[in-house]
Amino acid sequence: MKNLKVARRYAKALLLIGKEDGQAEVYREELEAFSSLFKANPDLEAAISNPIYEAKGRQALLRSVVEKSGVSAVTASYLLLLFDKGRIGFLDVITSEYKEMADELKGIARASVSAATELSNETIEKIRSGLGRLTGKEVVLTVSQDPALIGGIVTKIGDLVLDGSIRTQLLNLKETLKRSEAV
């Protein structure tokens, strides 16, 4: 919980700079690229963030990677600041928070839809426009297939979950029957 608060603070700080200089989207792309680099090379992340190794050596390694990656001066300074403050290990969470805040700034909501069967483009568009009306934002949908739902769909947007699946209806019916037997 504390790490999430810290991540939000650092993400918000970079986003404010991005709003000010109009480079918020550039910083987003650079953070995502650097975060992906760490995910693809866990040994690199460990070498940079593990306090067992000498700080000067880790910082030199980070500087070298930052210079070779060609990120903007602001992102480079930001990554070095994260290192200096001992927060470079939170880069993935910070990047995630930054993306959420940047989407909010642009009026974009991200949603996911799981369906038991493949959805037609027309159905996906109806869901997207319905969620757009509900939220008042442009909705970016991620669609997946989950046969375990039996039928219907489950939609998640932010903290809101709209579950219209047959599986959930059957589970609810089962619980209702159990309660009526207990009486």
From Swiss-Prot:
The keyword Ion transport applies. It is found in: Cell inner membrane. One of its GO terms (cellular component) is plasma membrane. It holds the Pfam family OSCP. GO terms for molecular function: proton-transporting ATP synthase activity, rotational mechanism. It is a peripheral membrane protein. Gene3D superfamilies: N-terminal domain of the delta subunit of the F1F0-ATP synthase. F(1)F(0) ATP synthase produces ATP from ADP in the presence of a proton or sodium gradient. F-type ATPases consist of two structural domains, F(1) containing the extramembraneous catalytic core and F(0) containing the membrane proton channel, linked together by a central stalk and a peripheral stalk. During catalysis, ATP synthesis in the catalytic domain of F(1) is coupled via a rotary mechanism of the central stalk subunits to proton translocation. This protein is part of the stalk that links CF(0) to CF(1). It either transmits conformational changes from CF(0) to CF(1) or is implicated in proton conduction. Belongs to the ATPase delta chain family. F-type ATPases have 2 components, F(1) - the catalytic core - and F(0) - the membrane proton channel. F(1) has five subunits: alpha(3), beta(3), gamma(1), delta(1), epsilon(1). F(0) has three main subunits: a(1), b(2) and c(10-14). The alpha and beta chains form an alternating ring which encloses part of the gamma chain. F(1) is attached to F(0) by a central stalk formed by the gamma and epsilon chains, while a peripheral stalk is formed by the delta and b chains. This is ATP synthase subunit delta. The gene is atpH.
